[in-house]
Amino acid sequence: MNQKCSLVAIVGPPNAGKSSLLNNWLNKKISIVSSKPHTTRNNVFGSVTKEDTQVVFVDTPGFAKKHGVWGKHLQKSMYESLKDVDTILLVIDSLSPFKLGTEILFDVAKKTDANLLVTVHKTDRPKKSKLYEIGRWLKESKSYEDPIFLTSTNTKTGTEKLLDKIVSLAKEGPWLFDKDQDTNLTKEWIGAEYVREKVFQSIHQEVPFNIAVQPTEWDFNSEKWVLRVRLLVRTLSHKKIIIGKKGFKLQQIGSAARAELMSLWGPGQLFVEVVKDNQFEETIKELYYSS
């Protein structure tokens, strides 16, 4: 069997649905999802293997303005993902399609040698007139004549058709992952990211953007898995918010993450502690983008 392989960068503005598409194709959640922008902080790799063809997706952070440490890292991480990829998949949010990031990413992608595919996502929600408006903008303003894929992970509409197109563009070459390996993330980091997701879903305002997660101890070889995760925060006030009155909020976060991890791995234990990190900026550099 002659192997085929393709490296595909999934790009788009924050909260466009990039992680949802990747999780849909993997049929499991490796890239966390929330309604807040900038949930994805690093490039997350996920691989889908169909017969002789392997597609390795790079789920990138949403395009961010260069404000602060996070903004600079997110933008750098996104641009780095476009180097040496075979295909760029631009995800346009049908509910807010004309963001600055959408246009910038389209222009950047057109300057590369990669194939460019465009999907308008969340198409189960806007009016048809909005979809026509997006198509007109791509054709008239961006001279984009190729087919536009309409997708929704909520209704599973168009996602397989788009995946088939991506697979068809793969060229002959060795696979990058073993057939049974579907991500570059280790189990302990997947678990830690699930905890971070629950913080995003449970805590509002600026707090979720001022935390980092770190797996500290784990055992996946016993009958019941054990994972300890440290939630690092910038300030004592953030720590108090996450812990909540009588520890209720932290218990809620831990219970929600544990329930999802048990559905993924079976019975196990998750322990979460919250720590104020006096070297927070240095820690997040080391954890998320030291490379």
Can you annotate each of these PLM segments?
Residues 28, 47, 51, 81, ...:
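Conserved, well-folded catalytic cores of nucleic-acid-processing
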Residues 49-54, 73-146, 219-224:
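Conserved C-terminal guanine-recognition region of P-loop GTPase G domains, centered on the G4
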Residues 17, 158, 249:
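Conserved glycine(s) of the Walker
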Residues 40, 64-65, 97-98, 126-127, ...:
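Catalytic P-loop NTPase motifs of RecA-like helicase/translocase cores
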Residues 187-291:
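P-loop NTP-binding site
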Residues 59, 121, 152:
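Active-site glycine-centered loops adjacent to acidic/histidine catalytic or metal-binding residues
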Residues 1-83, 232:
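Conserved G1/Walker A P-loop phosphate-binding module
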